[in-house]
C-alpha cells in the first residue's frame, strides 16, 4: 500500500522559507529597500565624481588677463599633471609663464593646489611657472556673472558703482603723475645692478603695481621688492613719492634693511660720468657741433680774419684756408656756458650719473 506524502513536502518547504525570513529579519537582499538605497547612493557618488567642475584660471602677475574658464573632470584629465600640461598649452607665454604652468595657487595665494580634488566649483585659481605668487587684483577685469551661483541683479549694480568710484579716484589721484624716468638700484654688495623704469599715466596705476613692475625688472635674489628708499634714506610709501625731486631709489627685499651711509652713496662704477670727468667734457661727439655752428654763423668768421692772419691766409690758399682754420682757433667762444653745445653737455652730466647700464648709448644719442 503506497501513501502519497507530497503535500507534506510542500508544507515543509513553506515553513522553511518563513523560518529563514524571520531569522534574517529582512527580505531578500535583491528586493530590499536598503539595497536600492545603496545602489542609488553609489550611482550618485559616481556621477558627482564624473561631473565637471567649472573653475577659472589666471596667469601669475598678469593684471590685464581676464582668465580662462575650464571644465575640470576626471574623464577629461586623468591626472593633475595632465591638467598642468593642458593649461600650459592654453596659457603659456614668454612674459608671465615662460616655463609653462607648474604651480596652481588659490586666488589669494594662501594655498597651493596639489590635486584636482582640491579644486572647488565656481572658484578662481592662479597658474604660475615658479614657486612665487604675485599679488594682483585678478578678478577686477572679470564679469562676475560667469558663475551660476551668483545672482545677476546684484552684480549688475555693483560694477557700475565700482567703476564710477574707481574713475573718480583715478582722476583725483592721477593729477601728479607725469612722464618720469627713475633709476632703481638693487641693495647689496657693490657693484650693484641698476635698472631704469619709465613712469607715466599708463604704467603707474598704483603703488603696489609699480612695486610689482620693479620686482620684475630688478630681480632681487630675495624675491619681492618690499621697500624703496631715496639716496637721503627716506622710505617711499606712496605713488606720489616717485614724482618728487628724487630720481634714484634703493630697492630692498623682505630682509631687514640696515641703514648705512655707504648704501646710499654711489661709487665710481655706478657714477661713471660726473661734472669733473674730462672724458665727458671732451667726447668724440663734440667736434661736429662747433663745425656746424661755425659754418652757419658769420660772427666767428669775421673775428678770425685779423690783419696779420688774413695776409698769411691769402698768400697760402686764399679764403678757404681761413675757413678751415676757424674751428681750431675759435673753440673757446663755442664752449661758453651760454652756448647750446655747453648746455647739451651740462644736461648729460646731470643725467648720466643716474644711468648705470646704458650710459654710453645715451651719451652717443644725445
From Swiss-Prot:
Principal place of residence: cytoplasm
Disulfide bonds: none
InterPro entries associated with the record: DCX_chordates, Doublecortin_dom, Doublecortin_dom_sf
Posttranslational mods: Phosphorylation by MARK1, MARK2 and PKA regulates its ability to bind microtubules. Phosphorylation at Ser-265 and Ser-297 seems to occur only in neonatal brain, the levels falling precipitously by postnatal day 21.
Alphabetical keyword list: Cell projection, Cytoplasm, Developmental protein, Differentiation, Microtubule, Neurogenesis, Phosphoprotein, Repeat, Ubl conjugation
Residues that bear Phosphoserine: 28, 47, 74, 90, 110, 115, 265, 287, 294, 297, 306, 332, 339, 342, 355, 361
Gene3D superfamilies the record matches: Doublecortin domain
Modified residues (Phosphotyrosine): 70
Phosphothreonine found at: 289, 326, 336
Region annotation Disordered: where it falls in the sequence: 275-366
Pfam families assigned: DCX
Acidic residues bias (residue ranges): 357-366
Biological process per Gene Ontology, one example term: regulation of postsynapse assembly
Comp. bias regions, Polar residues: 307-341
Tissue: In neonatal tissues, highly expressed in brain, but not expressed in heart, liver, kidney and spleen. In adult tissues, faintly expressed in brain but not expressed in muscle, heart, lung, liver, spleen, intestine, kidney, testis and placenta.
Gene Ontology molecular functions: microtubule binding
Localization: Cytoplasm; Cell projection, Neuron projection
GO-annotated cellular components: cytoplasm; cytosol; glutamatergic synapse; microtubule; neuron projection
Doublecortin domain mapped to chain residues: 53-139, 180-263
The protein's assembly and partners: Interacts with tubulin. Interacts with USP9X.
Function: Microtubule-associated protein required for initial steps of neuronal dispersion and cortex lamination during cerebral cortex development. May act by competing with the putative neuronal protein kinase DCLK1 in binding to a target protein. May in that way participate in a signaling pathway that is crucial for neuronal interaction before and during migration, possibly as part of a calcium ion-dependent signal transduction pathway. May participate along with PAFAH1B1/LIS-1 in a distinct overlapping signaling pathway that promotes neuronal migration.
Listed name of the protein: Neuronal migration protein doublecortin
UniProt source species: Mus musculus (Mouse)
Lineage: Eukaryota, Metazoa, Chordata, Craniata, Vertebrata
Amino acid at each position: 500500500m503506497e501513501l502519497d506524502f507530497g503535500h507534506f513536502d510542500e508544507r515543509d518547504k513553506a515553513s522553511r522559507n518563513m523560518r529563514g525570513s524571520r531569522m534574517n529579519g529582512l527580505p531578500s537582499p535583491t528586493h530590499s529597500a536598503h539595497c536600492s538605497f545603496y545602489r542609488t547612493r553609489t550611482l550618485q557618488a559616481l556621477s558627482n565624481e564624473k561631473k565637471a567642475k567649472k573653475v577659472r584660471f589666471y596667469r601669475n602677475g598678469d593684471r590685464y588677463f581676464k582668465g580662462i574658464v575650464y571644465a575640470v573632470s576626471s574623464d577629461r584629465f586623468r591626472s593633475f599633471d595632465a591638467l598642468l600640461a593642458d593649461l600650459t598649452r592654453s596659457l603659456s607665454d614668454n612674459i608671465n609663464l615662460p616655463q609653462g604652468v607648474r604651480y596652481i595657487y588659490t586666488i589669494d595665494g594662501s594655498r597651493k593646489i596639489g590635486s584636482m580634488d582640491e579644486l572647488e566649483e565656481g572658484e578662481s585659481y592662479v597658474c604660475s611657472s615658479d614657486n612665487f605668487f604675485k599679488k594682483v587684483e585678478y578678478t577686477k577685469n572679470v564679469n562676475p556673472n560667469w558663475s551660476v551661483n551668483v545672482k545677476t541683479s546684484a552684480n549688475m549694480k555693483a560694477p557700475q558703482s565700482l567703476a564710477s568710484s574707481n574713475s573718480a579716484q583715478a582722476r583725483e589721484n592721477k593729477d601728479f603723475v607725469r612722464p618720469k624716468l627713475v633709476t632703481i638700484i638693487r641693495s647689496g654688495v657693490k657693484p650693484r645692478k641698476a635698472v631704469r623704469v619709465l613712469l607715466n599715466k599708463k604704467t603707474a596705476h598704483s603703488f603696489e603695481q609699480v612695486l610689482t613692475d620693479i620686482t620684475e625688472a630688478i630681480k632681487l635674489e630675495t624675491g619681492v621688492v618690499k621697500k624703496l628708499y631715496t639716496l637721503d634714506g627716506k622710505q617711499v610709501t606712496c605713488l606720489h613719492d616717485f614724482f618728487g625731486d628724487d630720481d634714484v631709489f634703493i630697492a630692498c627685499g623682505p630682509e631687514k634693511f640696515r641703514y648705512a651711509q655707504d648704501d646710499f652713496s654711489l661709487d665710481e662704477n655706478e657714477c661713471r660720468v660726473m661734472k669733473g670727468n674730462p672724458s665727458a667734457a671732451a667726447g668724440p661727439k663734440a667736434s661736429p657741433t662747433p663745425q656746424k655752428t661755425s659754418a652757419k654763423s658769420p660772427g666767428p668768421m669775421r673775428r678770425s680774419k685779423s690783419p696779420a692772419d688774413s695776409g698769411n691766409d691769402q698768400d697760402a690758399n686764399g679764403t678757404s684756408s681761413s675757413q678751415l682754420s676757424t674751428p681750431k682757433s675759435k673753440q673757446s667762444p663755442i664752449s661758453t656756458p651760454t652756448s647750446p653745445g655747453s648746455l647739451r653737455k651740462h644736461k648729460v652730466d646731470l643725467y648720466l650719473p643716474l644711468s648705470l647700464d646704458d650710459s654710453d648709448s645715451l651719451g652717443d644719442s644725445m
